[in-house]
Amino acid sequence: MAAQGFLLNASFLLILLVLAKPLGSGLARLIAAVPLPGVAGVERILWRTLGITDHEMNWRQYLLALLTLNLLGLGILFCLLFWQEWLPLNPQRLPGLSWDLALNTAVSFVTNTNWQAYSGESTLSYFSQMAGLTVQNFLSAATGIAVVFALIRAFTRQNVHTLGNAWQDLVRITLWILFPVALIIALFFIQQGVPQNLSAYQPITTLEGAKQLLPMGPVASQEAIKMLGTNGGGFFNANSSHPFENPTVLTNLAQMLAIFLIPAALCFAFGEAAGDRRQGRALLWAMSFIFVVCVAVVMWAEVQGNPHLLAAGADSSVNMEGKETRFGVLASSLFAVVTTAASCGAVNAMHDSFTALGGMVPMWLMQIGEVVFGGVGSGLYGMLLFVLLAVFIAGLMIGRTPEYLGKKIDVHEMKMTALAILVTPMLVLLGSALAMMTDAGRSAMLNPGPHGFSEVLYAVSSAANNNGSAFAGLSANSPFWNCLLAFCMFVGRFGVIIPVMAIAGSLVSKKVQPASQGTLATHGALFIGLLIGTVLLVGALTFIPALALGPVAEHFSLP
């Protein structure tokens, strides 16, 4: 079993690197605002048609453009969901959503979280899925990538005040990266058996003679961008454990690769844009090390078997509860780590049914800020925040002004870095405390004791860090939970983006200083170790007390 797990993980990472490197080169061209081959003429027509100028923006203008797009999208999506019953492509005549569920869902998809307090096949029409959710899957992913583009330009430019044109970046990211790659993935899914139609649900008679209604819909097109954009919201309630979303082991592998593809490619793009590919590889090594360790822990925990079944004398060589037999325990464990290391949230197994330690690792990966590969764009700019913190700590230890890529890191950058890093822990801890202190929060818990607390902690961690996965034993479709999690999702997204853009605006105006003899090398093993230590230290100091009350306490209470 250990050898199988090693081969699965190694082959996954190898294929990922082979696919990510060429995509990284394309992303680097977009960061440099160089049109991809053969599309310059198309872009000129688009700019004229859409009224987009070549005027570059400072950080406030860039941020305002992104906020305008996202707030407009939030309002439109809320209206689509609230008045769903009056809109076309609703063959099942599904009613509109309640105001609180519509608000929660709209915020969820605009913020790239895709938390779902509803069952897709019994709640949303095809029009809501296509014109609402799928569109936001593209736009929220493009927003995250645009933010990291601006931050990378801040490191590579000097003595200027502009970070690019947000509208051009969004169009280029969507048309030349997200759409073509998602199209290829969608066609592969269709070939593997994922539905792509607008048919009404199909009544069938099972082999036992029972009547059943099979859900249909444009699944493949939404499934592709759901994974590529690290969105994670499933067309069906069972998400990627549903055979219509993830029918084969090949689609399962493709989905995991799609989740990590752009985050890994952005590391290569960062190195190329910075003029030193070692810088991007250093970040990739740090992410990969934490990822591999987490995969090993989850696989080890899940192959130990279910302690409750073992105590009852039943055969439980591995913990298969909540897992699909077509994937098995190892692929399910790998998927769980992939989807929570990235801010995706799609699941091919029920995380609530993992062992205490097996479920704690995905929760902790979210809590450290989704920086281990992370979401498209958000993962890299989150890791770069930890890079700034690491060079600041190193500067304190050796008595030098911290700098990264020749840019001196001053008080303003460190204040913004601290603010961005502390936003999500505050939301998680205060939100979980509020839920446990109120009757409205506790009434949603379906399990008592440490596991019930773990479900609450997981839900708020998932929302605040824009992941979207859940421990399913929580009845979260209530006004209290819909509003609490919507607030956490919104602040967790834009409460980080705003200080990141402020950092970019400060750094881009600075001069690049030549490296001196005492400059800390930020591409070697020493710095990689320091960066990993910084991520682990912040995560440990912040969340160990909460984890001790949940999964750790549950583990030690097992028979």
Swiss-Prot record:
Its main location: membrane. PANTHER family: POTASSIUM-TRANSPORTING ATPASE A CHAIN, POTASSIUM-TRANSPORTING ATPASE POTASSIUM-BINDING SUBUNIT. The system is composed of three essential subunits: KdpA, KdpB and KdpC. It is a multi-pass membrane protein. Part of the high-affinity ATP-driven potassium transport (or Kdp) system, which catalyzes the hydrolysis of ATP coupled with the electrogenic transport of potassium into the cytoplasm. This subunit binds the periplasmic potassium ions and delivers the ions to the membrane domain of KdpB through an intramembrane tunnel. This is Potassium-transporting ATPase potassium-binding subunit. InterPro entries: KdpA. GO terms for cellular component: plasma membrane. It comes from the Bacteria. It comes from Salmonella newport (strain SL254). The chain crosses the membrane at residues 5-25, 27-47, 63-83, 132-152, 170-190, 253-273, 283-303, 327-347, 356-376, 379-399, 416-436, 484-504, 524-544. HAMAP family: KdpA (MF_00275). Keywords: Cell inner membrane, Cell membrane, Ion transport, Membrane, Potassium, Potassium transport, Transmembrane, Transmembrane helix, Transport. GO terms for molecular function: P-type potassium transmembrane transporter activity; potassium ion binding. Belongs to the KdpA family. It is found in: Cell inner membrane. The keyword Repeat does not apply. Pfam families: KdpA.
